[in-house]
């Protein structure tokens, strides 16, 4: 189980090619949001708080193909919104597969049962099922009862039909290591390939702001979880759909800075600056403009107040992959022994900004209606001097 060898090989070859060409910045995963419309309203989601004019927008098949052709990443993660609402999603997925890209189709599973017939099992296609814990925890997270049971049934059906399936789990405040361990046991029993797991990012537009983990609490939770995992002799092994060094970072053992260009985001507004998570920083018209004109040094923990508690894989997985190429023996040790679960944690990045009041992104009215345009002020923070 875990990431298939063919995918590991293709990604490793791609990274090596970029390094041999001397490229400092290159993408690993294209984050594609072809729509923001969703059939759930999760408490911790900051992606769907838009008027109908925006929720009704879609990226076309041609726009999606142009995005992957422009950036060239070996992996595409299709998010949203709920991607299965998009009527052209089968053609979009097939277009990526024909280009030899590994596709993770993220879904809450509510539509997958009846849409599964539109797809064929392939080593290049994975259904990434949103599953935020055990039944009680997940249903509370998505604000609807019965969704967990739907996910379980759909996972079993997809696995029976030969599809690759992973679970995508976001952890929030109040969760305990034993509770997460119980979820991991459930996920492994369902036969998923692995679990993508990370602390939730505190979206400014999320309906609830009291559910997000702080950075220190996140690290301790993962240490406690991995400690439980190491004590499970004779029980089913846990598989994560992430690199060993990223998991080691979650446990507080690596002092990583984020690599936002590793997961560039294309959505209905354009190429989102600087990453998948930050809303309100503006958009580039082209991938080249995103890479060349984004002020990357303004972002990251210690560099921007919006980034301070972020430990999400879309920012740090690329950092971990690069570190594995620089320090293969370290990566091998962590892969064999697992993340360290005691001792001092790695130091946090120094704060190099002075925080100033930051207005929330807002919708701009025009005439009698609301236009489909988001005001996107640049973060108002300055580097500290001296």
Show where each model-derived region lies.
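Flexible mid-to-C-terminal extensions adjoining Fe-S/redox cofactors in radical SAM and related proteins
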Residues: 272-386
